[in-house]
Structures are given as C-alpha cells and as structure tokens.
C-alpha cells in the first residue's frame, strides 16, 4: 500500500466504500418481509448519508425457495428494485447478493445493460470456491462489478 493511500483513523479515504446491507442481512430475521415504503425510505436515507452501495437482498432461486414464504427481497426481481429506485439517477450504486448453490445465476442475473443493479456479491464457503469463481466470471462477463464473501 503506497503512502498516497494512507490516512489517519478519521481521514477521508476514497478507496474505502460503504455498503449498507440492512435489507439483505435484516431479511434473514423477517424472511425479507419489508414494505416498499420502508425500502424506499432506507434508499433515500442512504443517498442522503452518502452511502456508496445499497444491497437490496438476494438473487435466490424461486425453484429452491417458496415465494409464498419469503418477501420479494429474497429474490430481488428487476421490476421490484426499479419500483423503488427507478433508473437510480444517483451516485449510490445498487447491490445484490447471490449464494453459491442457491441461485440460478445464469438465468436470474440479467445482463448489466438490462439492469439497474451495479454490483453482484457472491457468498461462498471454502469448499464451494470453484462454483463461486464461475458465478463471478459470469457476472463480470455480463458487465457487473463483483465481490466475493468467503
């Protein structure tokens, strides 16, 4: 790490980004049953706060998870995200998480040009890293920013 990237504890570091995962992480507690009003309010609050990325939830397979038992943010359909953000004409980027083995990523993750999503975060365990790499490569080819959570 070069000296030009060093900072003090409280200095501004443009290379550090803030991602709010309230919906995705909180959805594990309430089965993703957030109202559109709550999601929209959180979206607007994150914009005002200068958050870099807002994670809306998962890209989970509707073949593996019952849509009647989970709220829409378990699946993050494009139309549902757009209902909240429109074309997202803000500096904040939109993120979703996809778990290895729990999403049909080739079908459920659209080409970036057809989506308001900017970042796909792939969650994996050590033993499923090869499958995670396949998912990351697919998302990258589709035009997304990508990260991996191990």
Mark where each language-model region is.
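Glycine-rich anion/phosphate-binding loops
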Residues: 31-41, 124-131
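Short glycine-/small-residue-rich flexible loop motifs, especially phosphate/cofactor-binding loops
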Residues: 19, 43, 136
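Active-site beta->alpha loop and helix N-cap motifs at the rims of alpha/beta catalytic domains
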Residues: 47, 53, 58-150
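Short amphipathic alpha-helices and their capping/turn segments at secondary-structure boundaries
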Residues: 1-11, 39-48
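N-terminal small/glycine-rich loop or linker at the start of catalytic domains
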Residues: 7-31, 91, 115, 145-148
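A short N-terminal beta->alpha junction/helix N-cap motif
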Residues: 27-34, 68-72
């Amino acid at each position: 790490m070069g000296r030009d990237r060093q900072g003090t504890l409280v200095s501004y570091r443009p290379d550090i980004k803030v991602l709010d995962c309230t919906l995705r992480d909180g959805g594990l507690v309430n089965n993703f049953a957030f109202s559109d009003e709550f999601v929209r309010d959180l979206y607007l609050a994150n914009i005002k706060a200068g958050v870099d990325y807002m994670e809306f939830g998962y890209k989970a397979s509707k073949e593996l998870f019952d849509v009647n038992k989970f709220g829409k943010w378990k699946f993050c359909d494009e139309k549902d995200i757009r209902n909240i953000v429109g074309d997202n004409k803000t500096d904040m980027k939109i993120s979703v998480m996809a778990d290895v083995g729990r999403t049909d990523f080739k079908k459920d993750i659209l080409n970036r040009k057809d989506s308001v999503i900017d970042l796909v975060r792939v969650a994996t365990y050590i033993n499923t890293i090869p499958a995670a790499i396949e998912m990351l490569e697919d998302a990258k080819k589709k035009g997304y920013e990508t990260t991996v959570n191990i």
